[in-house]
Amino acid sequence: MSRIARRFAALKAQDRGALIPYLQACDPDYETSLALLRAMPGAGADLIEIGVPFSDPSADGPTIQAAARRGLAAGATMARVLEMVTRFREGDADTPIVLMGYLNPIEAYGPARFCADAARAGVDGLIVVDLPPEEADLLEGPAADHGLDIIRLVAPTTDDTRLPLVCRHASGFIYYVSITGVTGTRTASADELAQALPRLRAATDLPVAIGFGIRTPEQAAAAVRVADAAVVASALIATLEDSLDAEGRAGPDTLKRVLAQLEALGRAVRNART
């Protein structure tokens, strides 16, 4: 059983959902993002998504695009991202790590080499937002060879013909994009989520995480009442950005502010079903 499957099984046994926070690698610098990564499990993270900075993040809104620019300016590369995971694993063997990004950096690295190095570093799953199932052969084989889950995105616009294809090529969990458009732009209503989830449940036995548009503890709690996990990205990145100084450097309270927000989200998720 994979680390992702074990974590979801353990949470299901406790009848609680998962909180999946997101951070952008090397935002605003390598050491700050590593310190944040290391502190996230203690602040309430059940799984963690690490964004791989890319120069053309077309699925992301302005907040995460700005984070990607900061990460690239700080020297982020795929090798540095994997090094960060390796260093995280020195102190945490249990928290699942998912890399989220775009195909271009993986192709530049070499898909087979990337999957081998990612697994060796301690990565558990991959979300490649611009890799449709029809073109996934180049990554699915190497990922399976090294025990990496390929997490698929399902959107409100995914119709009943396409949904089984997407789910058939997925492992780990399904990432339900709760809104149309880019990240961080609006929030799905509870009614919209309640209507969408039964269709997903009928198509897959995998856990379902809801992302894109979850910003507050209340929204995270509402998400895990109908799904298995809530992903929070733009809201945490916005808090980090607000803590930076005029030159874009980490402030004295950067970690404290982001982790306090994460703790509030974690409390809401833990208590959502009680």
Swiss-Prot record:
Q: Which GO terms describe its cellular component?
A: cytosol
Sorted UniProt keywords = Amino-acid biosynthesis, Aromatic amino acid biosynthesis, Lyase, Tryptophan biosynthesis
N-terminal signal peptide: none
Q: In which pathway does it act?
A: Amino-acid biosynthesis; L-tryptophan biosynthesis; L-tryptophan from chorismate: step 5/5
Residues at the active site: E49 (proton acceptor), D60 (proton acceptor)
Q: Which family does it belong to?
A: Belongs to the TrpA family.
Molecular functions (GO terms) = tryptophan synthase activity
- Function summary: The alpha subunit is responsible for the aldol cleavage of indoleglycerol phosphate to indole and glyceraldehyde 3-phosphate.
Q: Report the enzyme's class at the first EC level.
A: lyase
Report whether Glycosyltransferase shows up as a keyword of the record. no
Which top-rank group of organisms is this from? Bacteria
Show the catalytic activity: (1S,2R)-1-C-(indol-3-yl)glycerol 3-phosphate + L-serine = D-glyceraldehyde 3-phosphate + L-tryptophan + H2O
Biological classification of the source: Bacteria, Pseudomonadati, Pseudomonadota, Alphaproteobacteria, Acetobacterales
| EC number from the UniProt entry | 4.2.1.20
Subunit structure of this chain's protein = Tetramer of two alpha and two beta chains.
Q: What is this protein called?
A: Tryptophan synthase alpha chain
Does the UniProt entry include the keyword Amino-acid biosynthesis? yes
In the UniProt record, the gene name given for this protein reads: trpA
